[in-house]
A protein has these predicted regions:
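Bacterial N-terminal signal peptides that target proteins for export
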Residues: 1-10
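Boundary at the C-terminal end of the N-terminal hydrophobic targeting segment
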Residues: 22-26
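Extended, low-polarity segments enriched in aliphatic/aromatic residues
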Residues: 28-318
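Bacterial N-terminal signal peptides
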Residues: 10-19
């Protein structure tokens, strides 16, 4: 190893150690939206980032299996750092679930077969069966008293599932919009047409729009309301593991494996995930900048629509 590589390795290792140190020092401190209120939704957390760890928090949710089980994941782009398929092994065995996703707007995710090819490349086919929801046609899910959308749109195969489990690789410092459970069951659940509706605030179902943040945040909230009303039996799991930040946020770092978090409340789950990552910010001003950059206000809009609550009780499972 040459001198330059040695220096890079040392710096990278130091950054991971520093992130772990921050996490350890604050482990006994309450998170930003953590509460002791008895009526607050429960969020379960384990540091065990494994298939067994994921099953621990899933079992704690006590979701009753009804009919066919769909496990909503994102198969991702060809070179994307996606959820590790092996984490789903025990969940799929326990539920006999099918991994489901929808097509994307980019050229390499345009068709069902393209997406399934990426899924096979990432290894999802080695842990269970897969289905693209929108390989045939679309269905509309009504939005009741939303901000902008009249309906959200996904693939017609979604009607085949009665029990839904969202499992997502949570990333705060990735794309502009927060990468969590809400995104997984709104934009990622949407068919190509459904994605266009969200990006346009409901005005266009055929073309992508580079939308203002508040329009996108409200559209996410509307689409979440639609998904929760259309299918009642949901569980939500975020895997908050190691990844390299891909944005320009000041002070953003690889936090290493924080853990796996689960809840029946998607708003509480995403807020808790944000709180775990955002507490590594060097001060309140930096945290606020991170949250603004990644449109965290969508959680407030979703809460106001009755999709969940941002304050939560945290229960650690060891």
């Amino acid at each position: 190893m040459n001198k330059r590589n040695c220096i890079f390795t040392a710096v990278f290792a130091f950054s991971l150690i520093s992130a772990a140190s921050v996490f350890a020092q604050s482990a006994s401190q309450k998170l930003e939206h953590q509460t002791d209120e008895k009526d607050a939704p429960i969020v379960y957390f384990t540091k065990d980032v494994s298939s067994e760890g994921l099953m621990k928090v899933y079992k704690a949710l006590n979701q009753k299996k009804q009919g066919k089980v769909g496990i909503k994941v994102s198969f991702g782009a060809p070179d994307e750092d996606v959820l590790k398929p092996a984490l789903l092994t025990d969940l799929i065995k326990a539920t006999d679930g099918t991994m489901i996703d929808s097509c994307g707007l980019s050229g390499n995710r345009w068709t069902a077969e393209m997406n399934l090819a990426h899924a096979r490349k990432h290894g999802f086919d080695r842990v269970g069966s897969m289905q693209m929801l929108d390989e045939k046609s679309d269905i509309d899910m009504p939005v009741k008293k939303g901000y902008l959308l009249k309906y959200a749109r996904t693939g017609s195969h979604f009607d085949e599932y009665d029990t839904l489990v969202s499992v997502f690789k949570f990333r705060m410092h990735f794309l502009p919009a927060l990468d969590g459970a809400i995104k997984n069951v709104t934009l990622c659940l949407g068919s190509r047409s459904g994605k266009c509706l969200i990006h346009s605030g409901g005005s266009d179902s055929k073309h992508y729009h580079d939308t203002k943040p508040d329009v996108l945040e409200k559209s996410f909230a509307d689409a979440l309301r639609a998904a929760l009303d259309y299918k009642k039996n949901w569980a939500f799991i975020n895997v908050v593991d190691s990844y390299e930040p891909e944005d320009s946020c000041h002070g953003a770092k690889n936090t290493g494996n924080i853990g796996i978090i689960a809840s029946r409340d998607p708003v509480a789950l995403d807020q808790c995930s944000v709180d775990f990552v955002a507490r590594t910010a060097e001060n309140a001003e930096v945290r606020a900048a991170w949250e603004e950059a990644h449109q965290v206000k969508m959680l407030e809009y979703a809460e106001n629509l009755g999709c969940g609550r941002r304050n939560y009780r945290l229960v650690e499972i060891k």
